[in-house]
């Protein structure tokens, strides 16, 4: 039985306290049946690789995949998107042009772009180097979880790179604002 809570938290219970083999520990032992009384976080990967959210934003990426997977010609607001993703990289293109890349792979939720701002929530197994396409040769202020991490300038091709500290099961909200 899965009970959904805010964000991606869930409470898990199993009939007769039979814990699935997928929940074994590193040493191969099953955890205590008490696990059904604790809250655990579910990976927020995007199983369909890319989707449009109810609020009109894009979500994409699946960092849990061992093999490269992609979706091409995904239509969103009149543009065609292509996503390539797996544990080592996640890359998004719009109409054949670069938009987002992370190394290693990540899951991105609520990706939105306006004239002056890019916002998204990102999750991954470990810290990631993220590159986004912005306006050429402009200055931006970067925020992670509402905290300013400094000003950055895009290069002549409009790319801005930042490092984000990630831990599986926890999203980091990124906001990039043109100065």
Feature locations, PLM:
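Catalytic domains of carbohydrate-active enzymes that cleave complex glycans
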Residues: 1-86
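Short, ordered beta-strand-loop transition motifs
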Residues: 5-6, 110-117, 154-158
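C-terminal beta-strand-rich structural cap/linker in extracellular carbohydrate-active enzymes
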Residues: 19, 23-33, 67-96, 100-102, ...
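A short, sequence-level motif marking secondary-structure junctions
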Residues: 39, 135-137, 153-159
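Small-residue (G/S/T/A) turn/hinge positions that recur once per unit in extracellular repeat modules
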Residues: 104-108, 147
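Surface-exposed beta-strand/loop patches in extracellular or lumenal glycoproteins
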Residues: 121-138
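Beta-strand signatures of extracellular beta-sandwich domains
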Residues: 141-143
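Surface-exposed loop/edge segments in extracytoplasmic proteins
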Residues: 146-152
């Amino acid at each position: 039985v899965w009970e959904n809570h805010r964000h991606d938290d869930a409470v898990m219970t199993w009939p007769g306290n039979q814990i699935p083999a997928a929940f074994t520990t590193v040493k191969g032992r099953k955890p205590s049946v008490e696990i059904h009384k604790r809250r655990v976080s579910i990976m927020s990967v995007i199983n369909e690789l890319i989707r449009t959210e109810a609020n009109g934003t894009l979500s994409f990426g699946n960092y849990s995949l061992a093999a490269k997977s992609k979706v091409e010609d995904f239509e969103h607001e009149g543009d065609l998107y292509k996503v390539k993703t797996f544990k080592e990289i996640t890359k998004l293109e719009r109409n054949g042009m670069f938009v987002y890349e992370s190394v290693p792979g990540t899951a991105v939720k609520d990706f939105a772009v306006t004239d002056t701002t890019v916002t998204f929530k990102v999750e991954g197994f470990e810290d990631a180097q993220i590159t986004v396409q912005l306006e050429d040769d402009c200055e931006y202020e970067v925020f992670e979880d509402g905290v300013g991490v400094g000003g950055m300038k895009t290069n002549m091709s409009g790319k801005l790179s930042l490092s984000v500290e990630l831990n599986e099961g926890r999203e980091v909200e990124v906001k990039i604002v043109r100065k």
